[in-house]
Amino acid sequence: RFPTVYVIKSELVEIRGSGSATREIRAFMHPDNFPNAVKLNAVEVITPDGNTSSYPPHRHDGIGDCPFHNEEIYYFRIGEIDSPHGCSSGFGFHRTYSAPQDSISFDDNISVRDGDIYLVDRGYHGPCTALPGYPMYYLNVLAGPSLERNMGFCDDPTYSHIRQDWKTQRTDPRIPWRISK
């Protein structure tokens, strides 16, 4: 049996990206914060309305030159301004596409609604886009065959400039996220 792990919320929250790619990560089951799990990783992502997350597109499928291998599940919740989730009219977008070295070619651009679940077992994925007026939350759960648990990823080199661009942009002031109602 594993010992009980207690982590203070303020130690879990990370602000990632900047500009319209600012989002909040709650890394409650990241290997650094929850070291006793064997395979499972999990984080929550909060994307303000009009912003993108899971960006730049990345992969962790163990194919080609990417050494990280995790399947990933996205569980989406779509809200309205000042409401955490449960909006039946709102939706967002998610993209998953093949890397050049993949044996199968695909490019899936899908709309996601409140309560949708999406499995990423290979390829690049991102961005997730929250439409104006509809903030997006998702729970990411990752696990894979690696002997050492990790949340590593390989960015799509086409978008290598994105992380550099963030250095010249301000973070979105809506993050950290607060519900005002």
Regions found by a protein language model. Give the residues of each.
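A short glycine-rich, His/Asp/Glu-containing loop-to-beta-strand
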Residues: 24-73
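Generic recognition of flexible, low-complexity loop/linker segments
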Residues: 63, 107, 126-127
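Double-stranded beta-helix
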Residues: 1-27, 132, 139-181
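A short secondary-structure junction signal
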Residues: 2-8, 39-41, 51-60, 85-87, ...
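Conserved metal-binding segment of the jelly-roll/cupin
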Residues: 1, 111-133
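Short, conserved beta-strand element in jelly-roll/cupin
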Residues: 44-47, 66-105, 111, 119, ...
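Short, acidic Gly/Pro/Ser/Thr-rich loop/turn segments
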Residues: 50-54, 81-84, 127, 146-148
